[in-house]
Amino acid sequence: MTAEVTAADAEVLLAQPRGFCAGVDRAIDIVERALELHGAPIYVRHEIVHNRYVVEDLRGKGAVFIDELDQAPAGAIVVFSAHGVSQAVRGEAEARGLRVFDATCPLVTKVHIEVARMRAAGREIVMIGHKGHPEVEGTLGQAQGGMYLVETVEDVAALQVSDPGNLAYVTQTTLSVDDAAAVAGALKARFPGIVEPKKSDICYATQNRQDAVKLLAPECDLVLVVGSTNSSNSNRLREVAERKGVAAYLIDGAHAIDPAWLQGRRSIGITAGASAPEVLVQQVVERVRELGAVSVRTMPGLEESVAFPLPKGLSRKIAQTESLE
């Protein structure tokens, strides 16, 4: 042991489930398969998922991350990120002759379909979400007008709509379950006739990881959340732990751990956002062990078995390539 030891004899508790969800797995697979089929460069609009490690790994394999489609040459292969895009972006891609592989999470696509259906029925739509998040921008861009964005209960109180009797609402898929429920409750109280989604828009992985932290936090005196600062669902995990009265930090990886955080801690919880790979979790565990932790235990929890298929166009190309080998 060295003088750096700060978590002497502490136990590490791992949340279950944690880390990659099916939508993130699929999105990364799409970029990697596109690179295998077509070679570099493959252009990706926005970060494929909100994780620095994942983005840098794909960049090293030949992915080029762009903010707007005009940064890709005409006719190039472009991947849309897991967060989804607006109808305007889809139209621009078609107009420029870009070959698109769509990595939009199927659960985000479900919300897009809800928006189209509700607008076709003549309803205005309130979206619960974080302003400026790519998923929110993509969902708001599914309709030309008739949509409103709220983030808080206070936003609901100040909301002015054209037809209060003909409203529906949807939510960003990565919100705090508790916060979204509070805002939805405020919407239903103010607009009693508002139509809600047939099934919650918050995705299974967001729900499961937040539930896991609710079980983890009472057993710990510190929680480390592995995830990037621009990851919505990772930030929500940190907030869930803090609301349970536990100190919590969001970290990109083991290098970000301040040994002082671990001083005197007896039980250190670790989880990871849906866009954070397990390799980063294991590096964090190893670093905490270097700082004095003596045991590692995984909490009981759900074993997820969700998987999403690749886009049909990409699957066909893979099958054609394999048949020629």
From Swiss-Prot:
Annotated active site: 135 (proton donor)
Swiss-Prot/TrEMBL cofactor(s): [4Fe-4S] cluster
Organism: Bordetella pertussis (strain Tohama I / ATCC BAA-589 / NCTC 13251)
Enzyme class label: oxidoreductase
GO terms for biological process, alphabetical: dimethylallyl diphosphate biosynthetic process; isopentenyl diphosphate biosynthetic process, methylerythritol 4-phosphate pathway; terpenoid biosynthetic process
Residue sites binding dimethylallyl diphosphate per the record: 50, 83, 133, 231-233, 275
EC assignment: 1.17.7.4
Protein name in the entry: 4-hydroxy-3-methylbut-2-enyl diphosphate reductase
Pathway(s): Isoprenoid biosynthesis; dimethylallyl diphosphate biosynthesis; dimethylallyl diphosphate from (2E)-4-hydroxy-3-methylbutenyl diphosphate: step 1/1; Isoprenoid biosynthesis; isopentenyl diphosphate biosynthesis via DXP pathway; isopentenyl diphosphate from 1-deoxy-D-xylulose 5-phosphate: step 6/6
Record-linked HAMAP family: IspH
Organism placement in taxonomy: Bacteria, Pseudomonadati, Pseudomonadota, Betaproteobacteria, Burkholderiales
Family: Belongs to the IspH family.
GO molecular function: 4 iron, 4 sulfur cluster binding; 4-hydroxy-3-methylbut-2-enyl diphosphate reductase activity; metal ion binding
Keyword Cell inner membrane: no
Record has Iron-sulfur as a keyword: yes
Sequence positions that bind isopentenyl diphosphate: 50, 83, 133, 231-233, 275
